[in-house]
C-alpha cells in the first residue's frame, strides 16, 4: 500500500434523536446525527403497525362494484 494517500480512520460519535449515542469507526471527522437507530426504530422495538390502507383495486371496487351486480 502507498503511504500517505489513505484518509485517517478514527472513532466517530453517532447521536440519535431519541438520545442514544454510540461510537463507530469511520473516515468522517464530525459527529453524526441520526433520525432513528436500533433502540427507537419500530422494526427493532416490535412496535410495528400494519398498514390497512386500501389499494387501487379496493378503491375501484368501492366506486364501481355496485354497477356489476345488476
Curated annotation (Swiss-Prot):
Top-rank lineage group of the source organism: Bacteria
UniProt keyword rRNA-binding, yes or no: yes
Cofactor descriptive note: Binds 1 zinc ion per subunit.
Positions annotated to bind Zn(2+): 16, 18, 37, 40
PROSITE patterns per the UniProt record, alphabetical: RIBOSOMAL_L31 (PS01143)
Keyword ATP-binding: no
GO molecular function: metal ion binding; rRNA binding; structural constituent of ribosome
Key words, A-Z: Metal-binding, Ribonucleoprotein, Ribosomal protein, RNA-binding, rRNA-binding, Zinc
Region (Disordered): 48-70
Gene3D superfamilies (alphabetical): Ribosomal protein L31 (4.10.830.30)
A Pfam entry, by short name: Ribosomal_L31
GO biological process: translation
Cofactor: Zn(2+)
GO cellular component: ribonucleoprotein complex; ribosome
Membership in a protein family: Belongs to the bacterial ribosomal protein bL31 family. Type A subfamily.
Quaternary context: Part of the 50S ribosomal subunit.
Functional note: Binds the 23S rRNA.
Database matches in PANTHER family: 50S RIBOSOMAL PROTEIN L31, CHLOROPLASTIC, LARGE RIBOSOMAL SUBUNIT PROTEIN BL31A
Name of this chain's protein: Large ribosomal subunit protein bL31
Organism: Photobacterium profundum (strain SS9)
